[in-house]
Amino acid sequence: MKKTKIVCTIGPKTESEEMLAKMLDAGMNVMRLNFSHGDYAEHGQRIQNLRNVMSKTGKTAAILLDTKGPEIRTMKLEGGNDVSLKAGQTFTFTTDKSVIGNSEMVAVTYEGFTTDLSVGNTVLVDDGLIGMEVTAIEGNKVICKVLNNGDLGENKGVNLPGVSIALPALAEKDKQDLIFGCEQGVDFVAASFIRKRSDVIEIREHLKAHGGENIHIISKIENQEGLNNFDEILEASDGIMVARGDLGVEIPVEEVIFAQKMMIEKCIRARKVVITATQMLDSMIKNPRPTRAEAGDVANAILDGTDAVMLSGESAKGKYPLEAVSIMATICERTDRVMNSRLEFNNDNRKLRITEAVCRGAVETAEKLDAPLIVVATQGGKSARAVRKYFPDATILALTTNEKTAHQLVLSKGVVPQLVKEITSTDDFYRLGKELALQSGLAHKGDVVVMVSGALVPSGTTNTASVHVL
């Protein structure tokens, strides 16, 4: 069974009910909506379509809204045509938005461009395809020397590696998009270009103000500043997305894999969910099979311990969206089979909190008894994530009375959430857990299961792990 979860970006190729049903069958767990593209009517329809499919099939999936975030882009060019730049030529950026650009100058969307940059800084355009060095700053103009040949287009992303920029965490568009997300009841917000703790807090306050206090925030780490402040960002967030696209432009490409491993490890220790994203099966936008390197990349992220792997263009606009999900699911399943439980966390000598100690004990017991299933009663999802931290061989069946929690646990590795009407007592939990263990096919008559619950089942400290034979 596949334990690693798959996040699929949904676009024109995959938005119909028919396609969404096939994507769920193929292994999709979370629908990602990229708010850098599309309007509210399109995104609203996609959400409705997924909910219709879920109610018809009884399958559970989560919805993730990915914000555009505070980014810098190039503006208009003459005739809307790309311009060719040559290595060695001079090129100027201006903050005067009325300028229509050409092969010598273009306007950028960010007012503070001239104040944040210094002579000697690097400017990268279009995912780093064109590099420039700042040679002078005059008034509202930044004058650069072009470092390599390339074609510059309008509305292309501009990165300033190593420069701390004063853009707000939430652009006006993001604020409106988050309100839309609250109205639609999305499960997660993936917040782009998070640079520091206060960015996350600002987003959380905005969500709270519009009835979205239960939406989980996944912070996307996309630049050096985000990496430098990673610990404080992790603490303020519900999870992390390792956004390797922009990150690989902002930091040297050979550093990205080490940043990925560091972030995944810290997320596991903190019991926070982590998604590894960008270019995972990139060649499948055009080809029916991935490269061997891509298949290895997906497996490597899973071995690192990621909760989920993500498809972007592969599922939103590619030629082979279904094949991409199927192949990714196959790689997940194969790699999940070789993962061992991790009861020995290095340097984990600190005293464990009650919940964590009980959950760790449950995993240890399940390993020793070869139990195929650990059943957890969880209100907000903490206990289920505490069990997941130790990578049990057993599947985790998480019973919750909270619909939001059920959807959010869809993203956690190895967790199968199950919404139940009520759990009145510990005995009721044992009865219900055993019934659902058999019904779901996750365990069979005669199997040993480990059950984890609290004294006050509705909420409170998880303090009991017990062993049952079905």
Swiss-Prot record:
Task: Tell me the first and last residues of the signal peptide.
Answer: none
> Which positions does UniProt annotate for Mg(2+) binding?
222, 246
Control of this protein's activity:
Belongs to type I PK; fructose 1,6-bisphosphate-activated.
Q: What is its EC number?
A: 2.7.1.40
What keywords appear on the UniProt entry?
A: Acetylation, Allosteric enzyme, ATP-binding, Glycolysis, Kinase, Magnesium, Metal-binding, Nucleotide-binding, Potassium, Pyruvate, Transferase
According to UniProt, where does the site described as Transition state stabilizer lie? 220
- The record's disulfide annotation reads none
Q: In which pathway does it act?
A: Carbohydrate degradation; glycolysis; pyruvate from D-glyceraldehyde 3-phosphate: step 5/5
Tell me a GO biological process for this protein. Answer: response to heat
Q: What's its job?
A: Catalyzes the formation of pyruvate in the last step of glycolysis, it is irreversible under physiological conditions. The reaction is critical for the control of metabolic flux in the second part of glycolysis.
> NCBIfam families, from UniProt?
PRK05826.1, PRK06354.1, PRK09206.1, pyruv_kin
Query: Which protein, by its recorded name, is this?
Result: Pyruvate kinase I
Source organism per UniProt:
Escherichia coli (strain K12)
